[in-house]
């Protein structure tokens, strides 16, 4: 792994404890909405600590779940999360999205991972290869309109007593202060996913006070 990629994975390892345990209501609503689109075998690209696993596995049409993440500590925590909900099978793979081999997905998701991908077009094309024809892919990522300070200030009212809240807040502030992340306007993101071969069923910015783009995408029935 290149040094830059190693440093990013290390940063996510440091974030893993607070990320998994702190769930502001805005994040809860996001997980619930994304999970509602899932069916069959689900693949989560950039699964982090697996916070969405219980929301996905409770969907009646979902049969199984696989998560992929490059940060080893996130992977460990996601595996633990899957073990807490054993009614349906889950599998967590350690690696970069563009390099792993997993079973093709009936539906797929990626939440707040896109902005950290070193080559977004390459990763989107890989996701397309791992999605069955006609499959749904829900892509959710913070946008150029995000006001992280305001979002965290609102979340503090409900999370301030959580023992990992301060750690969660500081890491999220650092994310948005980074010059290496990729934040697009919604129309820019739509053009990129279309160029990668996806059609757009839905697109909105209703969550995170307008600072998150959520796209419901579909792979053509005619693509392999």
Roles of regions detected by a PLM:
Residues 180-196:
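Short alpha-helix
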Residues 49-99:
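Class I SAM-dependent methyltransferase SAM/SAH-binding core
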Residues 107-120:
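A short SAM/SAH-binding and catalytic strip from SAM-dependent methyltransferases
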Residues 1-38, 40-48, 51-55, 138-165:
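Conserved class I S-adenosyl-L-methionine
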